Regions:
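Sec-dependent N-terminal signal peptides
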Residues: 3-13
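N-terminal helix-cap/turn-to-beta initiation motif at the start of protein domains
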Residues: 17-32
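Short, solvent-exposed coil/turn segments at beta-strand boundaries
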Residues: 26-27, 53-63, 88-92, 109-115, ...
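Short, solvent-exposed loop/turn elements at domain surfaces
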Residues: 38-43
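N-terminal glycine/threonine-rich, aromatic-flanked beta-hairpin/loop signature
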Residues: 44-90
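Short, surface-exposed beta-strand-loop junctions and turns on beta-sheet-rich folds
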Residues: 70-73, 101-104, 123-126, 133-134
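Edge beta-strand at a domain terminus
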Residues: 80, 117-142
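Short beta-strand segments that buttress and anchor functional surface loops
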Residues: 94-99, 118-119
Length: 142
């Protein structure tokens, strides 16, 4: 009986951990692609001026657009946006995107204040919070 109680406690503990891996309110803001996994390969972004995904969320609806910080340290935003809706099915969260060109969906595998992991078409996209504020404030401090 004692072993059964211990096993049940472990299951409950690990279930609580996994359910807290998605903090949906943390989606708001800027996200920088860290790497992409596909078929056991890891791909990392290359280039001097990375693109960032900017999410604006008023649950359950939101807007996604791409932004870029150029060498002049100004943030440039794409005029193209994708509207989205957060949907929860069977304890899993999905982002349902809709642009003027197409519709697609990504599953949220992990989301907290520092890390976002999305899955789409057998690819896993790993994002991190960029240090944009330090970059912008560095110019003002000079």
């Amino acid at each position: 009986m004692k072993i059964l109680l211990i096993c049940f406690s472990f299951l409950l503990f690990f279930n609580c951990i996994s359910s807290h891996s998605i903090e949906i309110e943390k989606l708001n803001g800027y996200w920088e692609i860290d790497h992409i996994n596909q078929r056991k390969e890891r791909f990392e972004p290359k280039g001097n001026s990375p693109l960032y995904d900017h999410y604006f969320l008023e649950y359950p609806n939101g807007i996604l657009n791409k932004v870029e910080i150029r060498l002049d340290r100004i943030i440039y935003s794409s005029k193209d946006i994708a509207n989205f809706k957060i949907e929860r099915l069977d304890k899993k969260y999905y982002i349902r995107f809709k642009s003027r060109w197409s519709e697609w969906s990504k599953q949220i595998k992990h989301l907290d204040s520092h890390k976002l992991v999305l899955e789409h078409n057998k690819r896993t996209f790993h994002y991190k919070r960029p240090d944009l504020y330090e970059f912008i404030n560095d110019e003002r401090g000079k």
